[in-house]
Amino acid sequence: MYWRRIRQTAVLALVVGAVGAGPAQALTLVPPKPDVLFGVSDQGTTQQFNEFTELLAKHPALLETFHPWGNSLNQAYERWRETGTRPVLAISTMDDQNLSELITPEQIALGAGDDYLLQLNDFFAKRGLPAYVRPLGEPNRCLNAWSAINCDGTQKGGEHTAYWYKEAFRRIAAIVRGGQTLEGLNATLAEIGLPPLNRTKGPNPTELEAAPVSIVWSPLPGGSPRVKGNFPGNFWPGARWVDWAGTDFYSEYPVWKDLKRFYVGKQWKGKPLAITEWAVSGKDEPRFVKQLVAWTVKHPRVRMFVYYAGFGPGTNTYDLRLYPRTTNTLRLKLRRETFLQYAEYNAGLFPPLPPPPPKTAKAK
């Protein structure tokens, strides 16, 4: 079993001591330089994870699970535990069966989804489980329910604007991180113009434990569609609410200038970067793999690299087994030791060592 008791105890000790009146200290969970956390998306079974691992001869450090709003984490937790991976929880507001919208950005911002956010905080805090939480990824992709732009380029308006997306993101970060008394949390929410905690299933907790989570903000590097108001910066919630900046990059849309522009974005220039989804689809693309791995290695702020493996047999165009040359190339590239197979529990949790004392001038 990969869970390491000593490290988990250290995390729990940090979390227990973090509850107070102020907001929880952000945890980046960044690996030591120059390491990159290699990951794969969750296909729903441990067997599929193991098959992916065998295919590439590389154990992924991360397992990214896509969940609709309100979903229980019990089954996902078992997969994370059995595979020895650190979780990446990607949260959607669309039903995964019929794609209907479960909750709007405005409703989240105003507290209609607080029961679920409290559930997430409690889940990760009680277990002392380090995780990356990726709420409402790709807000500038028109097909997502939480986007602000229609596919014809017009504004959705109403409950679906960039303003409400940013407010929803801030509320998610504040509650899921925890580490505050109820009074402190409500003060934080009021500071950004949002109503107090709104638990409907029982009374509000007197305090929220600090959860060892890192919040990932992840738009597309260029808008879909590419129109005014639909670029990454339009959806930036602010550095206070973001621990990682991430983006997705697929062989079907290899717009390298957008990826380069995202990397140098001024608003998130101080954040570690994640490739939260990447994949090959439609045809064998070994050249794309070589380019993307080389780009990742050459850009030191990129510290996470997650392959999107798709869902379902037969119609899954992201299945690497369809692309033997791509698979062979990726297998070779992942031999680099800097692509981590396991996530260390204490990575990014503890403050850096203090700087050495300044040198004093020698007496003459």
Predicted regions and their residues:
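Substrate-binding cleft of secreted/luminal carbohydrate-active enzymes
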Residues: 27-44, 131, 272-360
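Substrate-binding cleft of extracellular glycoside hydrolase catalytic domains
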Residues: 75-197, 210-212, 305-308, 317-337, ...
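Structural recognition of the beta-strand scaffold that forms the well-ordered cores
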Residues: 37-40, 60-66, 86-91, 131-135, ...
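N-terminal substrate-binding region of glycoside hydrolase catalytic domains
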Residues: 28-115, 280, 306
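Substrate-binding cleft/loops of secretory-pathway carbohydrate-active enzymes
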Residues: 191-211, 215-248
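Glycoside hydrolase catalytic-domain groove-lining segments
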Residues: 72-92, 237-285
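Secretory targeting and sorting signals
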Residues: 1-26
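Alpha-helical scaffolding within the catalytic cores
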Residues: 43-52, 70-79, 115-120, 200-203, ...
